[in-house]
């Protein structure tokens, strides 16, 4: 999770740095560390230890504390992912989870990308918007036309997020460099998407995603389709994968910083009065900024809606209690969280899925990860980094201002899946899904608007 500069009343910062001013410092520190030998391992320790479960899944715990922990049973796939062997060495002074989270939000660069926006009308009359990148600062990257059968990547941002978020833009650039089409799915009310029904979106509402996937599949009938979700977008994506199970039209997916168990995430979120309290208020502010534009839709509405509480929500729980849980028919906030967790869905996933988590994530705590269900599902691969915060991951060649450490791993995983799919026929089991209507299309400069909250749930 990260907070944009606007959400705390600071001047917006657009960090498109041509050079990395800290790289020399980092190199000096690395040289200093290299002068000292590694500590001897304890008696009986080995370079790599595999603990096999009855499901033949491996839990790889390495002596090097900077290497990620990996859980998965597809050894052939893991052998092809060279980036899995990279240690996670956070940028100097980024060892604290809050520092890494907030630094990434404020100081990660925002690539300039122009997009074509499609406004889609859903089956219930609701509206979502898709942003298709057209061009950017690197003209040569965007000038050439991609083959019609190039793979397509659907991106699902976090809570109140959209195509303006820096982590989304960096993934758009990386996908293009690899010759992939990509599109950002902006949920109802997010990134200036209009709200046309008295309903926003929730952690378990997958009908919009079903229709977006159908729309993309119809448009790119010769391409394999994949999806990447961050935080709340990851929870929605995994819920979708579990619901469609063996009838999933996606060829693969990636989940990053997924809260998984929303009850546990909510419990940890409200422990103490530290940074989590700051995050909660910032998130609530982002939701409040969306709501006033659409209050007329809730005038005179029946039910247990508490509009005054929603309009003044000081926490995400306030907003969910007054609006979200009522819109989607839950009895209470606790009922909503316990029945919307993607940890309930992971066992049903039959699509290749990579889950990347940070062990020190302040918003998606590691104790909420469904470790056993992931180990027992041969379609899932879990990577847990020792640090990273919430969608921070300020490490790797592009640190501190560039793309997060996870991006090369995400793209390599998708490329391996696509290579395996080339020989296989496309599966499109979406005939029973409503095809959304395109209401309008227009060009949009994505840098004109910044979400009040970035990198969050």
Curated annotation (Swiss-Prot):
UniProt keyword Hydrolase present: yes
A single GO molecular function term of this UniProt record: monoacylglycerol lipase activity
Record field: compositional bias (Basic and acidic residues): 438-447
Top-level EC class as recorded in UniProt: hydrolase
The keyword Hydrolase is assigned to this record: yes
EC number: 3.1.1.-
InterPro entries reported in the protein's UniProt record: AB_hydrolase_1, AB_hydrolase_4_CS, AB_hydrolase_4_sf, AB_hydrolase_fold, ABHD4
Family affiliation: Belongs to the AB hydrolase superfamily. AB hydrolase 4 family.
Protein name from the UniProt record: Embryogenesis-associated protein EMB8
Gene name, Swiss-Prot/TrEMBL: EMB8
């Amino acid at each position: 999770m990260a907070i944009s500069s606007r959400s705390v009343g600071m001047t917006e910062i657009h960090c498109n740095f041509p050079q990395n001013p800290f790289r020399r410092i980092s190199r000096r520190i690395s040289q200093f560390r290299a002068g000292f030998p590694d500590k001897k391992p304890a008696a009986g320790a080995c370079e790599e230890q595999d603990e096999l479960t009855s499901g033949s899944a491996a839990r790889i715990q390495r002596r090097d504390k900077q290497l990620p922990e990996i859980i998965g049973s597809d050894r052939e796939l893991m052998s092809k992912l060279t980036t899995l062997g990279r240690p996670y060495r956070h940028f100097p002074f980024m060892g604290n989870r809050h520092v890494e989270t907030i630094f990434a939000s404020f100081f990660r660069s925002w690539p300039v990308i122009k997009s074509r926006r499609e406004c889609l009308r859903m089956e219930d009359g609701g509206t979502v918007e898709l942003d298709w990148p057209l061009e950017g600062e690197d003209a040569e990257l965007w000038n050439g036309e991609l083959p019609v059968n190039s793979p397509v990547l659907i991106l699902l941002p976090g809570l109140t997020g959209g195509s303006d978020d820096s982590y989304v833009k960096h993934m758009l650039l990386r996908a293009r460099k690899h010759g992939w089409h990509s599109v950002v799915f902006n949920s109802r009310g997010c990134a200036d998407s209009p709200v046309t029904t008295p309903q926003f979106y929730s952690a378990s509402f997958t009908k919009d995603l079903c229709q977006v996937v159908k729309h993309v599949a119809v448009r790119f009938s010769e391409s394999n389709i994949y999806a990447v979700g961050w935080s709340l977008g990851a929870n929605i994506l995994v819920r979708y994968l579990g619901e469609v199970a063996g009838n999933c039209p996606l060829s693969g997916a990636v989940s990053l910083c997924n809260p998984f168990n929303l009850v546990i995430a909510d419990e940890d979120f409200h422990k103490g009065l530290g940074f989590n309290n700051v995050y909660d208020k910032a998130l609530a502010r982002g939701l409040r900024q969306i709501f006033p534009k659409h209050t007329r839709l809730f005038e005179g509405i029946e039910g247990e809606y508490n509009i005054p509480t929603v309009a003044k929500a000081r926490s995400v729980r306030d907003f969910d209690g007054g609006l979200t849980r009522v819109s989607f028919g839950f009895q209470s906030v606790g009922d909503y969280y316990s029945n919307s967790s993607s940890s309930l869905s992971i066992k049903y996933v039959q699509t290749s899925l990579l889950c990347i988590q940070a062990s020190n994530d302040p918003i998606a705590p590691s104790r909420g990860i469904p470790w056993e269900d992931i180990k027992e599902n041969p379609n899932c691969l879990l990577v847990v980094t020792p640090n990273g915060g919430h969608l921070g991951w300020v490490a790797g060649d592009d640190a501190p201002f560039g793309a997060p450490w996870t991006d090369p791993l995400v793209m390599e995983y998708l490329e391996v899946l696509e290579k395996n799919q080339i020989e296989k026929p496309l599966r499109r089991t979406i005939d029973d899904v409503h095809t959304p209507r395109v209401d309008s299309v227009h060009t949009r400069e994505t840098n004109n608007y910044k979400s009040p909250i970035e990198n969050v749930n």
